[in-house]
C-alpha cells in the first residue's frame, strides 16, 4: 500500500484484514482471518518554500533526478530543421501524476512545441517511483546562437527534511542559415 496524505495532523490507519478459506484434501475445512495492527501517523505541515522559489509546487520525495535527451546533437541546426528534447523527471516516493509540468521557455528565434507527456510508475524495493517525460519539438526560425535557460525544479527531500533544486544547465543551440 502507498499512502499520500492530503492534510497535516494525526491519521489513524485501520488494520488490514485478510480472510482465507482452509482447504484440506480438496475440501474447505474452515476459514482463517489475519489482521494487521492499526497505526497512527503524524503528518507534518508543508514547510515554506525557499524565497527564491516561493511559487514552487509541493513535491516531496526521497530522491529526485532530472535529465534531458536530444533526438540528435543540438550544436549545428539549420533554420527550419526540427529537433526534439525530452526532459525526464524521476521521483522516488511520488506518483507520476504529481510531478509538475515543466513549461517550455520562450526563446527568440526558436519555436518550441510541447508534446503529450509520457507518464510511468515503477514499484521499487524502497517505494513507488513516478516518472514524467515531457517532449518538446524545437525549430530554429532565425540563424544564430539560441540560449535555452537552465531548468530548475524545487523539491522537498523527505529524508533530509530540506528543500533541494534539481537542475539542467543552460544550453546553447547554434542555428545555421539554410544554404
Positions of PLM-derived features:
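Surface-exposed interaction/ligand-binding surfaces
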Residues: 1-179
